Amino acid sequence: MKHLWCICVFFLTSCATKGILETHILQGEPGEVDVIVFSSTDCPIANAMAPEIERIHISVQNAGGDLFLVHVWAGRTNIDAQKHADDYGLTMEVIIDTEHELVDSFNATVTPEAVVVLYDEDGTPKVIYQGLVNNLFDSPGNRRDEATQHYVRDAVAAGIKNEAISTSYRAPTGCIIEQKQ
Amino acid sequence: MIEILLATVFAQQEEPRVPTWKQDVHEIILSNCMPCHSSGGAGAFHLLRYEDVAGRASFIVELTRNGVMPPWKVDDSGLPVHHKRGISKEEIETIQRWIDAGKPEGDGAEIAICGGGLVIPDATGHTNPDTPWIIPAESAARWHKGIRDKRTFVLPINNPNPMKVTSLKFSTTAPRAVQMVCFVFDHQGRARMFDGWDPDEPGYEMMGDIGWVPSGAHGKIGPGSGVVSLPHGFHWEVPPNIDVVAETHFRPTGKIEQLSLSVDLFEDAIEGSRAVQEIVSMIRRIVIEADDDAFVATEHLDIPIAVDVIGITPRAGAECSGMNISSTNSEGTKQLLLSYSDWDPHYGETVFFTKPFRVMKGDTITSAWNFNNSDSNPRNPFVPAQFIDLARKTGVANFVLHVAPVQVEQASDLYEWNLSMLRKRQRAVQ
């Protein structure tokens, strides 16, 4: 299990672009579940899952947690992210990981890639699931009409109930995150 | 000493040059990724500037190595076809070496890739732009699963005179959501009747078949293609006031999209141009058990009139995993015409051969469709796999052969034979 680090990133809220740099630290109460989804404003695979990601956000929020959408491509600005959130009806907090600090921390490889975090009794965050959001895409170019397996949804539900998760990692498929040079 | 010097010289000559964006990579992108990955194209993102490509270079290499991009599913084993898309191994390797070298931009003038010029059509049809069809953010089951993520639209051409159509160009306001469009020319107003059933909604929720004519009989476009262009010397005869019926297959993009369509028809028929007809090879019904991953359906057609086959439009659902069509002459010589070893219904555009293939009277056209009704088929719409019993009067799996009779005066005989075959198959399978 990996532990979350405190990371300095740019961030904005979904409805009003603050446009300022702030320090953002992931924190949670014991038993709380947070979700991080690595994404990109123009990755068609991540975008196709936007409604599902928003549904997960609502369910996590209702349980007291948060979902953070992390845009990974360096060319993105707050304005791009705000327009993307508006277009796709996303209401979660959006992070632009310009320097790939979050990408490197979680060894994220593609978008979309999800990380589900459960805070234990003393508030220590632990990754209980990482990988595929669902099985809408078998691989890039191989898309089902609709997803039939909902891995993140299931992991969140299990985390909230503090139940064990059978598979903690599913190799994600999507748009490759270009390595920083 | 001389040997050492020569070895050094040769070693220096064999040292591959480091590729740069300006000298090497932009040309590869230009020839393989345009026009989709530019403004108004179907590509999800632009690949025009250095930053666009450098920011996705590894993804580009993966998709091209895996054959996902450029979109092209036709096997090389059939007849040579026009407008084949495919990036070479050498080109992919060049992009990889460019990545390994740190993606140098190179010296020279700033390079950005630009689009093409303006071509004026002879006739145009479009849906009402004031009432676009709303593509939902996610796929939604409709009144039966067979028409999921499909909508058929009527595009009146209002041509006062008959036309000899040689090509058809498609445009849409939602190019990233539209994956495939199957066209039929309707001169009987049948599609208008279907469209009128729900006057408040643009289009209608049915396949684009018109009578016995399957959707796509007059061309089909897929990812990477927006034009159906008949080979030189052939045309479609189109009567006055034709409607172009556009069975539109869309892929929800995650956000609501407003869909309007238009088609441009072009007349560029030369003197002596031959009218094209459609011979339909098909399986009307399939019955497949759950988990059967190797079900094969075949059909044989004995061609009664010599024809030149200029192209083929394939059609089958996602439960189909592969298909091929071949011709066998009276001496038993078999020629594979078209083959898909990895069929994806969203990539089944019309293909035209670089040279017409002549089928003589009495030759046999054999079609075979492979179905994988198991969970190992990543596109199987029936998940978990379930018993399938599908039937359609225009066929659940087809090859539409675009042909011209060798003897022009036999055109009506060919038409009548094709129609009788379609009726016969409908009676035979209940």
Annotate each PLM feature.
Chain A
Residues 4-12:
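Sec-dependent N-terminal signal peptides
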Residues 40-42, 69-74, 139-145:
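Second-shell loop/turn segments in exported
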Residues 29-44, 156:
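Short active-site neighborhood of thiol/selenol oxidoreductases, capturing the structured segment around
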Residues 31-34, 63-66, 90-92, 111:
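Loop/turn elements at helix/coil->beta-strand transitions in domains of secreted/extracellular proteins
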Residues 43-46, 114:
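The canonical Cys-X-X-Cys-His
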